[in-house]
Amino acid sequence: MRPPIHKLICKRLADQSSHHSQHLYHQYIVRNLPAVLQMWRIPTDVPQVAVPIGLKLAEVTADTPLDEVFKHWKESGGVILKNILTPAEAHQITTELESRIDSVQRGSRVPHEDLAAFHGAKTKRAGDLINHSATFRERILENDFIHAICQRCFGEDGHNGDYWLSAATTLNASGPQPAQVLHRDLTSYPPYALLGPEGTEPQINFLFAFSDFTDDNGATRIIPGSNKWPFHQRGNMAQTIPAEMKTGDCLLIGGKVIHAMGENKTETERKCIQLTVIPSFLTPAEAHPFIIKLETVKKLSKRAQRFVGFRSQYPRGSPGLWTKDYIELALHLGLDDLQGAMEDLQHVLNQPKQWDTIDYDKM
């Protein structure tokens, strides 16, 4: 079991105070501060000795028990969710988003060589999908299987228990185009580097195939088992395998697994939408409340409204984040009345508070 964040932090504080010596505490700070200040300056001279587990990615469906889904996911760092969309649904979403995608240029607008390479010179990364596709909202944003995975991931092992959408964007990569650099997605949230591979997940990614993913057209490449490696182990492209999928399938990966968009060796476009989900105490990649229209939000369920930041967030042990006058944001936005908001939050009101359940003596 992965130690939850609060236990790792509290244990560190308890260890410090147990020294009963300012001198020892000062030595501890001097010894560890450089590592904190250089969170993601992981040394490059560490021998690269980690090896992949050599597994093919498992394939599951929405009918697969979550225990089995998570077993495969935690073992290799990725799992393929089959037939989440029908080909007709995928085509409908593509059609509804056509004008939105056409309005976005290929390649990055940022004049920075590394960022431009990571973006992909022939890749279209279009956001603001929720306003433009009713089918996307109904079949992805409101998908019960997707939310069940999120609830399990961000609720287990002492995790914060609440989550929201970080980004919903296209990753439409035309070819020919070289592969991305191998990376871990958790680099967006540097403190998680201190927790190591046994820490809780800072984010998860659902990569939906809107065209077939093949080895030749740039299927996401992943190093199975690298989610368990020390973070100074970076792997290499020869250790990766392609996550080949049919249109409508979805690749689920966590923030700790090493992966990259593969090289597109063809003249065709590999079409993808990524749905990135994070604990609701972290900052999303997309500023949804400034992008999604209120008239669109009113068409969503309460769960989806909270998912995109139009309702308050309630991580375990918190009296509420993202509020107005210290109360549910939906009241301020006219999305609910007090009675409706309280009924919706009953599961939050009934949960034990984190500070009531921590046994500090046993940490």
Curated annotation (Swiss-Prot):
Top-level taxon: Eukaryota
Triggers of expression: Expression is positively regulated by the sphingofungins biosynthesis cluster-specific transcription factor sphG.
Enzyme class, UniProt record, top EC level: oxidoreductase
Cofactor: Fe cation
Family: Belongs to the PhyH family.
Protein keywords: Dioxygenase, Iron, Metal-binding, Oxidoreductase
Function of the molecule: Dioxygenase; part of the gene cluster that mediates the biosynthesis of sphingofungins, bioactive molecules acting as sphingolipid inhibitors via inhibiting serine palmitoyl transferase (SPT). Sphingofungin biosynthesis starts with the PKS sphB that produces an C18 polyketide precursor 3-hydroxyoctadeca-4,10-dienoyl-ACP containing one delta-6 desaturation and one delta-12 desaturation.
Protein name from the UniProt record: Dioxygenase sphC
Reaction(s) catalysed (UniProt annotation): sphingofungin B1 + 2-oxoglutarate + O2 = sphingofungin B + succinate + CO2
EC number, UniProt record: 1.14.11.-
InterPro entries cross-referenced by the UniProt entry: Phytyl_CoA_dOase-like (IPR008775)
UniProt GO molecular function: dioxygenase activity; metal ion binding
Biotechnology: The sphingofungins A, B, C, and D, show a limited antifungal spectrum of activity but are especially effective against Cryptococcus species, fungal pathogens causing opportunistic infections in human.
Oligomer and partners: Homodimer.
Pfam families (UniProt xref): PhyH (PF05721)
Pathway: Secondary metabolite biosynthesis
Residues binding Fe cation, per UniProt: H183, D185, H259
GO process annotations (BP): biosynthetic process
